[in-house]
């Protein structure tokens, strides 16, 4: 069965995710409106700026549709996308997870680091990245950086504090497709 991956395209780094999936031969739909959710099988919520993203979700009146989709279908949130999926006032509250925004520093403090995932070294690009600070027992820690979780999964939801779409390595995107 052919999968169609939606990439939320109202703000942030959605194009790099779309390009990564296209390089894997996957059909991609840029999601901007409520009816766009009806034609996709899974969704990526990209990085960007979480407050702006939340404001736009409400302004475009797609917050509720996004919540319903993420409650049952595979979803991958990177950086700001992970924040939106976590616990917090005005967030989707779909993960047993609390985050600290910009915990790894400001834009000038961005960095690249090797992390281990499924017995493979991958590159993590951390740009104003959140830190996953309270992880519930329903959440599986898939990867860490300096003893802090940076890649997590809870049921149908995958989140990363880093940006795998900014590398040439499709490992994390392939994992998401297999969920």
Swiss-Prot record:
GO molecular-function term, one example from the UniProt record: glutaminase activity
GO BP field: glutamine catabolic process; pyridoxal phosphate biosynthetic process; pyridoxine metabolic process
InterPro entries hit by this protein: Class_I_gatase-like (IPR029062), PdxT/SNO (IPR002161), PdxT/SNO_CS (IPR021196)
Entry keywords, A to Z: Glutamine amidotransferase, Hydrolase, Lyase, Pyridoxal phosphate
Subunit structure: In the presence of PdxS, forms a dodecamer of heterodimers. Only shows activity in the heterodimer.
Organism: Francisella tularensis subsp. novicida (strain U112)
Residues noted as binding L-glutamine in the record, renumbered to the chain: 48-50, 101, 127-128
Protein known as: Pyridoxal 5'-phosphate synthase subunit PdxT
Active site: 79, 163, 165
Entry annotated with the keyword Hydrolase: yes
NCBIfam families linked to this entry: PLP_synth_Pdx2, PRK13526.1
Pathway: Cofactor biosynthesis; pyridoxal 5'-phosphate biosynthesis
Pfam families from the UniProt entry: SNO
EC annotation from Swiss-Prot or TrEMBL: 4.3.3.6, 3.5.1.2
Record PANTHER family: PYRIDOXAL 5'-PHOSPHATE SYNTHASE SUBUNIT SNO, PYRIDOXAL 5'-PHOSPHATE SYNTHASE SUBUNIT SNO1-RELATED
Family, per entry: Belongs to the glutaminase PdxT/SNO family.
Catalytic activity: aldehydo-D-ribose 5-phosphate + D-glyceraldehyde 3-phosphate + L-glutamine = pyridoxal 5'-phosphate + L-glutamate + phosphate + 3 H2O + H(+); L-glutamine + H2O = L-glutamate + NH4(+)
NAD in keyword set: no
One GO location term (cellular component): glutaminase complex
The protein's role, per its UniProt record: Catalyzes the hydrolysis of glutamine to glutamate and ammonia as part of the biosynthesis of pyridoxal 5'-phosphate. The resulting ammonia molecule is channeled to the active site of PdxS.
